[in-house]
């Protein structure tokens, strides 16, 4: 949504305005002091932020806002070990339950395997993976196989740009 867009591209506006850093309010609703994490986008030239960008939790953002409203000076010292550590290999996990009548017709169900560092992955997307695997197990236990092939795909690298889904779509473009 709009909050995620601001997080992804806000650094571009901050850099153009001469900011030394950007502090972003978490888009998550967690009342504890764990900010929602996510990725930023490069600009139209493929360049990335040169200023540090951090997210703060909602309680901390509320406190900063109250201090600002009281006219207090607000200063930050940012220490972060975040950064690009190079490319890594990711993969998709694929399971087919072959259809009995038209196996070449594929019904695809899936979820994604990755999550963000501060999350448990339970909601994004552990729940989706669990539901998908449970549905596949129920289908596999039916007295007879389904008419069409059921393909279960657990996509990798969703959180960093739908990379697993895009790779799957490119590899299977003729099947769609």
List PLM regions with ranges.
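Conserved beta-strand scaffold positions in the cores of enzyme catalytic domains, especially
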Residues: 22, 53-57, 152
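Generic beta-strand/beta-sheet core signal
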Residues: 25, 110-112, 153-155
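Acidic/histidine-rich catalytic neighborhood of metal-dependent amide-processing enzymes
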Residues: 3-7, 13, 89-92, 115-176
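Residue-level detector of flexible, active-site-proximal loop/helix-junction positions
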Residues: 29, 60, 159
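Soluble metallo-hydrolase cores and metallopeptidase-like ectodomains found primarily
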Residues: 40-122, 134-137, 141-147, 170
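Short, well-ordered, mixed-charge alpha-helical segments that flank or form enzyme active sites
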Residues: 30-33, 86, 162
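Extracellular/luminal Protease-associated
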Residues: 1-45, 50-52, 120
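Loop/turn elements at helix/coil->beta-strand transitions in domains of secreted/extracellular proteins
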Residues: 17-22, 103-107, 146-150, 176
């Amino acid at each position: 949504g709009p909050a995620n867009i601001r997080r992804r591209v806000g650094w571009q506006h901050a850099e153009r305005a001469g900011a030394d850093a950007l502090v972003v309010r978490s888009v998550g609703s967690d009342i504890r002091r764990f900010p929602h994490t996510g990725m930023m986008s490069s600009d139209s030239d493929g360049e990335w932020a040169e200023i540090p960008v951090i997210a703060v939790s909602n309680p901390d953002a509320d406190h900063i806002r109250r201090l600002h409203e009281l006219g207090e000076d607000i200063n930050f010292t940012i220490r972060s070990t975040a950064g690009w550590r190079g490319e890594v290999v990711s993969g998709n996990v694929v399971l087919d339950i072959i259809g009995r009548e038209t196996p070449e017709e594929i019904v695809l169900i899936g979820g994604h395997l990755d999550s963000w560092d501060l999350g448990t992955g339970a909601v994004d997307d552990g729940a989706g993976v669990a539901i998908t695997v449970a549905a596949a197990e129920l289908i596999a236990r039916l007295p007879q196989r389904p008419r069409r092939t059921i393909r279960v795909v657990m996509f990798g690298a969703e959180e960093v740009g739908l990379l697993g889904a895009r790779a799957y779509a490119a590899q299977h473009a003729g099947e769609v």
